Every structure is written in structure tokens, then in C-alpha cells.
């Protein structure tokens, strides 16, 4: 004779919720011999039987409804199985407790509380996702701020050097005015970037077009002329006459050359040399290499130097170490779809390589660029 009491249950859950560990454990237990009840379990998909939500006044799913024996009881949340385990022994003793005048009817407050807990869990998940989105946006804005702040240094330094040169009689007033005007225009463009930080991802500020890398590198070399001539450093270039144009943002690509050449100058010895080469690597890419004969970079630091917020200690006497400039270079190269890396040996020097896409008639709307 089967003395097990009958228990009719309805599990209301979406298909994806049925794979959760709590629900899987619940179903497995109800189907096992460990459960001292004759279980009648109905599993319902709310989209197929929406009337169940209204009938049982469900405010959250998954939910387990005890239909009979009366009274009805509802469990909701992410711990339905543990809630049920607490009540099964009570239901099993229900006949005895009724004779003793003890009421095991579930508290409405408990039922509401468990459903509210599940709603709060959902709200917490949404808040976490929103927080993650905001954090990424703030990080993106911080990168732009650091990049623009770093870029401001170049025109300000150039303007300062021009003023000093004019005082020494090396350039006339007309030349000084020309330099100051050009540098102020650069600062104005950078200030526009700053104004857009709050509403725009910095990658979206790029304006890729058909450009000549040879001209860009020449401009950077001339802009830093004061620095390498002062230390009698020789700069050699190897740029093929048939090098194809590339698809890149002129201002940003110029910044990459300025940063890398400036680093090469900084880490070169007096009377040293720097070599700049460009090759048409494949049909889609041009590879640029800037080599110095400086102190070199330790192997364990060669990847870290491109990270945000990383500034390595000085690598040789009189140098201040690699700073934010290489992080800026990485972001710029990656947003163009290219990559940047370094090959270095202590006591021999460093070669920085980066790739830029060849211009093939594409435009920005074709989404040729990819995020780095």
C-alpha cells in the first residue's frame, strides 16, 4: 500500500531558466525516490500559458506553485529548491499538526518576500550591466584625455623652441609668427577633441583618408629637428618611391611618428643614429620600422610599455623612461586595424614596428577600421 501523500505542483519557468542549477536540482529531486510524496509536476512556459501569471498573481519567474493540497503556496527566486526542502517535512506532518491545532499555512509576507527578492536580483543584474557599460565609457574617455594631454605637449614645446630660436637670432619674426600660428591651430583642434569627450568615443574622432606616409614622417622629422641636431644624431630613411598611399587619419598618424621618433632620439646616445624604413608588406598593409641604438628594453617589459597607465622606470642614465606616448601609439594603430610591437635587445637597441592599411578606395562609412 502506498502511504505517500499526493502533491500537485506547477513550475512556471522560461526555457533558459530550466537549465539553472537550482531548477535542475529541484526537478531531479522531485523525480527521485528521496521525495516522500506522490508528485504531480507540471512544467509551464509563461509565453505559452500567460494566463498562469495572472491566475496565480506571479510577479517573478521561475516560480513553483503548490496547487494541492490546499492552501496554495508559491516559491520564487533563485533558491526555490532550498525553500521547498524546508516545507516538505512540514507538509508531511500536516495531518498531525492540524489535530494539534497548529496552522502551517504559509505566511503571505514570506511568499511576497521571496518574489521581491527575485525582482531585486533582476534589478541588481541590470544595475551591474549598466555599471559595466559606464565604466567602459569612462575608461574610453580617460584614454582620450590622456592622449590629448600628451599631444598638447608637442605644439607647446615647438612654440617654446621657436621663441628661443628667435631670441638667439636663428629665425626672424615672420618665421616665428608662422610657427606660432601653426601650433595654435593644432591646439585648437585638440581642444575640439576635449569638448567631445563627454559625448563621443575617442575612436569616433578619427578621420581616415588617403595619405602619404613619406610626407608624414618627413614632417615629424623636421618638427623634431632641434632635438636630434642638438645631439648630432643622424636620421636615415629608407622609403620606396613606389610605396602606396595608406588609409589613415593624418593627425593621428603624425602623432605616432612624433612619439616613436622622439623616443628613439631620447634613448639614443649623442652622435648615434636612427633608421626609419617602410615596406609594402602585403597587398593590404604597409609596415613601418623605427630603430635606435639605445640601451634596449628588457624582454619582460616589452609588452607592458604599450599598456595604459604604465610608465617604466628610466632605462639608461639621463632618460625618464617610456611613458604614455606608447600607449597612445597602440590605441591609434589599433583603431586603424593595424598592430604595433617592439623587437629589442639590451645594449643593442630597439626597433618599433607598426602596420597601416593600404588605401584601396575605401572610406570611413565602409567600417574598414576596427577597434583596438
From Swiss-Prot:
Residues 147-360 form the Histidine kinase domain. Signal peptide: none annotated. SMART domains: HATPase_c, HisKA, KaiB. The modification Phosphohistidine is found at residue 150. Pfam families: HATPase_c, HisKA, KaiB. Its EC number is 2.7.13.3. It is an enzyme of class 2 (transferase). It comes from the Bacteria. It catalyses: ATP + protein L-histidine = ADP + protein N-phospho-L-histidine. InterPro entries: HATPase_C_sf, His_kinase_dom, HisK_dim/P_dom, HisK_dim/P_sf, KaiB_domain, Kinase_SasA, Light-responsive_reg, Sig_transdc_His_kin-like_C. Keywords: ATP-binding, Biological rhythms, Kinase, Nucleotide-binding, Phosphoprotein, Transferase, Two-component regulatory system. GO terms for biological process: circadian rhythm; osmosensory signaling via phosphorelay pathway. SUPFAM superfamilies: ATPase domain of HSP90 chaperone/DNA topoisomerase II/histidine kinase (SSF55874), Homodimeric domain of signal transducing histidine kinase (SSF47384), Thioredoxin-like (SSF52833). One of its GO terms (molecular function) is protein kinase activator activity. Member of the two-component regulatory system SasA/RpaA involved in genome-wide circadian gene expression. One of several clock output pathways. Participates in the Kai clock protein complex, the main circadian regulator in cyanobacteria, via its interaction with KaiC. KaiC enhances the autophosphorylation activity of SasA, which then transfers its phosphate group to RpaA to activate it. In addition to its output function, recruits fold-shifted KaiB (KaiB(fs)) to KaiC to cooperatively form the KaiB(6):KaiC(6) complex (independent of SasA kinase activity). Homooligomerizes. Interacts with KaiC. Participates in the KaiBC complex, whose core is composed of a KaiC homohexamer and 6 KaiB. NCBIfam families: PRK09303.1. HAMAP family: Kinase_SasA. The N-terminus interacts with KaiC, while the C-terminal histidine kinase domain autophosphorylates and is probably responsible for self-oligomerization. The N-terminal domain stimulates the C-terminus to autophosphorylate. This is Adaptive-response sensory kinase SasA. It comes from Prochlorococcus marinus (strain MIT 9312). The gene is sasA.
Amino acid at each position: 500500500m502506498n502511504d505517500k501523500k499526493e502533491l500537485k505542483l506547477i513550475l512556471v519557468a522560461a526555457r533558459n531558466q530550466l537549465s539553472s542549477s537550482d531548477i535542475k536540482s529541484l526537478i531531479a529531486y522531485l523525480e527521485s525516490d528521496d521525495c516522500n510524496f506522490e508528485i504531480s509536476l507540471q512544467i509551464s512556459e509563461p509565453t505559452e500559458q500567460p494566463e498562469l501569471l495572472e491566475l496565480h498573481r506571479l510577479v517573478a519567474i521561475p516560480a513553483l506553485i503548490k496547487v494541492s493540497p490546499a492552501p496554495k503556496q508559491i516559491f520564487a527566486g533563485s533558491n526555490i529548491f532550498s525553500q521547498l526542502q524546508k516545507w516538505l517535512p512540514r507538509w508531511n506532518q500536516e495531518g498531525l499538526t492540524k489535530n494539534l491545532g497548529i496552522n502551517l499555512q504559509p505566511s503571505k509576507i514570506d511568499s511576497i518576500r521571496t518574489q521581491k527578492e527575485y525582482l531585486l536580483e533582476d534589478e541588481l543584474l541590470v544595475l551591474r550591466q549598466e555599471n559595466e557599460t559606464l565604466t567602459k565609457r569612462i575608461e574610453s574617455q580617460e584614454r582620450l584625455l590622456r592622449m590629448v594631454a600628451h599631444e598638447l605637449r608637442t605644439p607647446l614645446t615647438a612654440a617654446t623652441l621657436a621663441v628661443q630660436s628667435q631670441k638667439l637670432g636663428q629665425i626672424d619674426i615672420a618665421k616665428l609668427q608662422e610657427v606660432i600660428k601653426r601650433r595654435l591651430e593644432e591646439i585648437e583642434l585638440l581642444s575640439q577633441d576635449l569638448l567631445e569627450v563627454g559625448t563621443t568615443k575617442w575612436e569616433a574622432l578619427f578621420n581616415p583618408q588617403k595619405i602619404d606616409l613619406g610626407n608624414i614622417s618627413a614632417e615629424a622629422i623636421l618638427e623634431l629637428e632641434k632635438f636630434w641636431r642638438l645631439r648630432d644624431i643622424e636620421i636615415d630613411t629608407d622609403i620606396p618611391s613606389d610605396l602606396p598611399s595608406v588609409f589613415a587619419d593624418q593627425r593621428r598618424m603624425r602623432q605616432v611618428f612624433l612619439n616613436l621618433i622622439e623616443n628613439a632620439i631620447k634613448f639614443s646616445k649623442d652622435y648615434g643614429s636612427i633608421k626609419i624604413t617602410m615596406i609594402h608588406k602585403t597587398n593590404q598593409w604597409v609596415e613601418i620600422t623605427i630603430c635606435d641604438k639605445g640601451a634596449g628594453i628588457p624582454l619582460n617589459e616589452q609588452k607592458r610599455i604599450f599598456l595604459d597607465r604604465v610608465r617604466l622606470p628610466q632605462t639608461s642614465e639621463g632618460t625618464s623612461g617610456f611613458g604614455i606616448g606608447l600607449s597612445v601609439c597602440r590605441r591609434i594603430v589599433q583603431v586603424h586595424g593595424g598592430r604595433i610591437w617592439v623587437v629589442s635587445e639590451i645594449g643593442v637597441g630597439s626597433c618599433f614596428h607598426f602596420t597601416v592599411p593600404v588605401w584601396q578606395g575605401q572610406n570611413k562609412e565602409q567600417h574598414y577600421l576596427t577597434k583596438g
